[in-house]
Amino acid sequence: MLLAHISDTHFRSRGEKLYGFIDVNAANADVVSQLNALRERPDAVVVSGDIVNCGRPEEYQVARQILGSLNYPLYLIPGNHDDKALFLEYLQPLCPQLGSDANNMRCAVDDFATRLLFIDSSRAGTSKGWLTDETISWLEAQLFEGGDKPATIFMHHPPLPLGNAQMDPIACENGHRLLALVERFPSLTRIFCGHNHSLTMTQYRQALISTLPGTVHQVPYCHEDTRPYYDLSPASCLMHRQVGEQWVSYQHSLAHYAGPWLYDENISCPTEER
């Protein structure tokens, strides 16, 4: 199994720019082109929320067109910038597993050595996350049904504070309910989130919990400064690979850079310098 995991694309309406100057649509189209050109091709691409910026139909039209050009199966979940009904209307054709209920978008993928569980942590009218009773009950049933098979959850909001002064106040408000499932089910070993626009990792019991960078703009990690900074530091995604019984995640740059070159020991340490 190999998954490419991106997040927080924040598509805008055609011709509009994010914050008035960031061409997110062009940048995301470039990301799609890079993913389509990967030498080691993923089995699927995951997008963990905030697909669009303002929840408008025109933004979802752009998102569907650009994300629809990916040459891989696509797994999508909404974030706090998304409109649930419009998300489902425009993007369900790209991810039919989401079902037809905008208030209960979730799915389980059991095609790999690790079970993949996708849930919606967004709540209309707020940037904070929330897990409904139905979502918790569904997760509990899925984890019980999966037995000892390892399970990974993809959601938008991190379920616990990460020491980020800007983003912690808008994390998942009742994430403790998910952490209680981590305690009950040893098979739940990973939780991957978007939302924070930065690569952050922590651990709760046996579960690795991580957020990842956005595809275009990033949010610097600050422990004390609550001012809402963002920047255009190089974007990246995560690649998740099943290696035997191990799950290995690594960062893949989405910036344009020179290389790669084949390693040559004679150039690395020339004979005359030995």
Curated annotation (Swiss-Prot):
Stated family: Belongs to the cyclic nucleotide phosphodiesterase class-III family.
Activity control: The active site contains a binuclear metal center, with a fully occupied alpha-metal ion site, and partially occupied beta-metal ion site. The presence of substrate promotes the formation of a catalytically competent binuclear center by significantly enhancing the binding affinity of one of the metal ions in the active site.
Gene: gpdQ
List of residues binding Fe cation 2: D50, N80, H156, H195
Biotech and industrial use: Is of interest for its potential application as a bioremediator in the destruction of organophosphate pesticides and in the detoxification of nerve agents. The Ser127Ala mutant, which possesses improved metal binding abilities, has been immobilized on magnetite nanoparticles and shown to be active for multiple cycles, and could be stored over a prolonged time in the immobilized form without loss of activity. This system has the potential to be of potential use in the bioremediation of organophosphate contaminated waterways.
Annotated catalysed reactions: a sn-glycero-3-phosphodiester + H2O = an alcohol + sn-glycerol 3-phosphate + H(+); sn-glycero-3-phosphoethanolamine + H2O = ethanolamine + sn-glycerol 3-phosphate + H(+)
Protein name from the UniProt record: Glycerophosphodiester phosphodiesterase GpdQ
Knockout mutant characteristics: Deletion mutant is unable to grow by using dimethyl phosphate (DMP) or the phosphotriesters as phosphorus sources.
Induction record: Induced under phosphate-limiting conditions.
Misc note: Diester bonds are cleaved in two separate (non-processive) reactions, indicating that GpdQ may regenerate its active site after the first hydrolysis. The metal ion-bridging hydroxide molecule activates a terminally bound hydroxide nucleophile.
CDD domains hit by this protein: MPP_GpdQ (cd07402)
pH dependence: Optimum pH is 5.0 for mono- and diesters hydrolysis.
Reported function: Catalyzes the hydrolysis of the 3'-5' phosphodiester bond of glycerophosphodiesters such as glycerophosphorylethanolamine (GPE), a typical phospholipid metabolite which is probably the natural substrate of the enzyme. In addition, exhibits a broad substrate specificity and can catalyze the hydrolysis of various phosphomonoesters, diesters, triesters and phosphothiolates. Preferentially hydrolyzes the phosphate diesters over the phosphonate monoesters.
EC number of this enzyme: 3.1.4.46
One Gene Ontology biological process: glycerol metabolic process
Oligomeric form and interacting partners: Homohexamer. Trimer of dimers. Tends to form a dimer under crystallization conditions.
Sequence positions that bind Fe cation 1: D8, H10, D50, H197
Effect annotated for changing N80A: Strong decrease in affinity for the substrate but 4-fold increase of the kcat. Displays greatly diminished metal ion binding affinity in the beta site
